Amino acid sequence: MGKEKTHINIVVIGHVDSGKSTTTGHLIYKCGGIDKRTIEKFEKEAAEMGKGSFKYAWVLDKLKAERERGITIDIALWKFETSKYYVTIIDAPGHRDFIKNMITGTSQADCAVLIVAGGVGEFEAGISKNGQTREHALLAFTLGVKQLIVGVNKMDSTEPPYSQARFEEITKEVSAYIKKIGYNPASVAFVPISGWHGDNMLEASSNMGWFKGWKIERKEGNASGTTLLDALDAILPPSRPTDKPLRLPLQDVYKIGGIGTVPVGRVETGVLKPGMVVTFAPANVTTEVKSVEMHHESLTEATPGDNVGFNVKNVSVKDIRRGNVAGDSKNDPPMEAANFNAQVIILNHPGQISQGYAPVLDCHTAHIACKFAELKEKIDRRSGKKLEDNPKALKSGDAAIVEMVPGKPMCVESFSTYPPLGRFAVRDMRQTVAVGVIKSVEKKIGGAGKVTKSAQKAAKTK
C-alpha cells in the first residue's frame, strides 16, 4: 500500500446484534484488502459448512478467529479503500476486550461508526439503560474520538420494510442521546443502510427513494452525500503528530540471532530514525538505534502510525520490556512517573471505590497495578464542573479527579501532550471498571541510568 492516500482509522461500535460484523464485512469485502483467492476459499468453506448464503459476517468471523489465535494475520484484510482514504478498522467490538483495546488502542480512531439496528424492538434493546450502545458512544467521546457517523442498519427488517418513519424516529432518539454525551448531532451523518443487502452502503438504495441524503455542518466545512461510503469520505483527515517528540510504547522485545535485540512497537508521536539515541523509560536505558524496519523493509524514518521493529546496540532483552516507552534522549525524553492526576469515569463497579483501591491499569502497552491514592474531587461527567471535594467513595456513573500512584515503575504522559499515552482503562474482576484520561504527571527524577557504549560514541560523533 503506497502513501498516496491518507490513512485513517475507524472504530465500529454498537450493540451486539446491531449487524456491525455484517456491515464491516461488507465494506471489507467490496472495497477491501481481501484478495479473490481468500474470498473463494472463504466461500467454499462457507458452502461446506452449510453457510452457503455466505454472510459477510463470515469474513469477519474468519478474520477474528485468526486474530484471536494469534496468527499474524495480514493486516490488509482489515483495510478497505474509499476514493479519498485507506481505512483501517481498528477493532470491531464484540470481544470482551473491546473497551480495553479501544483505550490502550493500538491506535487512536479518527472516527467512530455507530451501528444501530432499525428492526422492530432491536433499536430499543440496544439503547436501553443496559445496552452497550450508550457505553460505547460515551467511551468514544471520552477518549477523544470526536467524529461520529451513525448507520441505521437492518432497514430491510423494519415494519414495513425500509420505513422512513422508523428511520426518522431512530435518528431523533440517537441525536438526543449523543448530544447528551457531547457530540453535536448537526455534524453527524445519519445513513439508513442494510449491511446485508447492501442498501446505501456503496451505492444509493432504490428501496429508499424517500431518503434525500445526509448533510452535516461543521466549522471545517459542510458535507453531504447518500451512502455510508460517502460519509467515510467526509471524515476530516487527522493531523498526525510528527512534530512532537518521539514516543514509542513497546509491544514486544525480541532477541534475533545475528542481529541482536529488537524492540517492536508503534510510533505514536514523533519520528524514529536510524542513528538516533533513544531512552527507554521507566527502564532508564539509553542506546543508539542501528536500523528501523517495517514489514521486513528497512526505513529511513518511521512516523506516527507505523508499526516497526528497530535494532538497538548493547542492550539485552532483560533490560527492556513490553510497556516501556522509547523516546529521543535529546528531546523531552520519556521518564518514569512518580504519580499522576487523572479524570476517571466509573463504568461498572459492583461496589464502591475508595482511597487505597489498587486495580490494574492498561495504558498504551503497559499493564500495571496503580493505587487510587487520593480522591480529590467528584465532578459532573459532561461539564467537568466540581460537585464535591474529597469524596469518600465513587460508584458506577461517577466522574472524579484522582491521584494515582503506580505500584511498579511506569511511564505515562498527560493526555494533552501525548494523547495515546494519556488514556487508560481500569481493569478489575475481568472487566473494565473505569476509564480515565491523565491531566498531569509528576516525573520521577532518577539518577543516571544505563547509557550504552554505542550511545556515548554516537553522542561524541554528533
Swiss-Prot record:
G1: annotated segments: 14-21
Domain of life: Eukaryota
Any one GO BP annotation for this protein: translation
Region spans: G4: 153-156
Chain intervals for the UniProt region annotation (G2): 70-74
UniProt keyword GTP-binding present: yes
Modified residues (5-glutamyl glycerylphosphorylethanolamine): E301, E374
Similarity remark: Belongs to the TRAFAC class translation factor GTPase superfamily. Classic translation factor GTPase family. EF-Tu/EF-1A subfamily.
Designated name of the protein: Elongation factor 1-alpha
Gene field: eef1a
